């Protein structure tokens, strides 16, 4: 999985700056984004053949993230397109039910993480 430092090479600087870093608050080397920004991050990840294997939701108090313990994840056998659609659907539904005071931290990695270990070495 990518960590916060990896996003420098993935998303534009302005999008990176709007992200909420989780390192200081929770010791997690990752970034959460508000709804519109996370949707952009997901589109960028898909366009770069990356996969979203799941993610976590944080409630925002001001700009401070608070763990909700809500999350989503793909199932064994899901492909990259399924993972993207699941993330979009989960986040969109979560926002519709709970409002805008949330940030979403997608777990993004290279597409190869969906392959079996022997498939990765055969290439």
Predicted regions and their residues:
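N-terminal domain-onset segments
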Residues: 21, 39-47
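Amphipathic alpha-helical binding modules
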Residues: 81-122
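Structured alpha/beta or helical-core interaction and ligand-binding surfaces enriched in interleaved
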Residues: 27-28, 32-41, 77
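Acidic, low-complexity, intrinsically disordered interaction modules
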Residues: 47-92, 96
């Amino acid at each position: 999985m990518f960590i916060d430092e990896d996003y420098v090479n993935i998303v534009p600087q302005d999008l990176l700056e709007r992200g909420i870093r989780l390192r200081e608050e929770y010791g997690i080397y990752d970034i959460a984004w508000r709804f519109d920004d996370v949707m952009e991050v997901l589109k960028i990840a898909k366009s770069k053949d990356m996969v979203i294997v799941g993610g976590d939701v944080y409630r925002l108090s001001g700009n401070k993230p608070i763990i909700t313990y809500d999350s989503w994840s793909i199932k064994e056998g899901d492909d990259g397109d399924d993972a993207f659609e699941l993330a979009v659907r989960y986040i969109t539904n979560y926002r519709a039910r709970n409002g805008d005071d949330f940030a979403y931290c997608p777990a993004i990695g290279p597409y190869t993480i969906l392959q079996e270990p022997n498939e990765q070495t055969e290439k």
